[in-house]
Amino acid sequence: MIKLNPTSNPKNLIQTLSKDESFIVLQKLFRENPDLEKVICETALKVVSNVDAEKISNNLYNDLLSLDVDELYARSGNGRYGYVDPNEESWVMFEEVVEFYIGEMEKHHQRKLPHIVKEYCIGIINGLIKFSEEANTEFSEWVEDAPLDHIDYVIDCYEKTKPEAKDLDQIMSNVEEL
C-alpha cells in the first residue's frame, strides 16, 4: 500500500484531485462506509440546493449575450454539407444555450427537488425576458423573436415535471403580465 510522505500535507493531495479522481474517492468512501451515506447526501443536497432564480436569470442572460455573430457566420453559409441559413443557425445557437438550462431544470426534477425546478423555470423565463428587453448585440438582432417564443417551451418543459398547481399558477401569472 502506498503511503503519503510524512512531510506532505494531506489537504494538498485532496485539493489537487481531478473531478474524476474526486468522484472515484467519493464512490469508494460511500461503498466502504455506508454510515456516511446520510452525511454525503446532506452535503450533496446543500451543494445542489444553492440555487436562486435571479442568479440563473443573470447567468442565462450573460450566456446569451456572449453568443458571437462571428461564430454565427462561421457556422452558416456555404459549407461542406451544403448551405446553412444564418437565420436558422442563429436560432440553433440560441437554443443550445437555453437547452443547457432546461437540462439543469430536468436534472433537478430527476433528483425530486421541485423547489429547485421552480427556481430554474422562473430564472430561465426571466433571463429570456431580460435578453428580449435589454440585449443590444449584433447577434441578438438575429434572434429578436426567439426569447419570447421560447417561454412557452420552457413552461411546457416545466409542466412535464408535474408541478403543484400553485407553483404553475405563480409562473403563469408572471408570464401573463408580459
Give short role names for the model-derived ranges.
Residues 1-12, 24, 31, 35-178:
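Eukaryote-biased, non-catalytic alpha-solenoid scaffold regions
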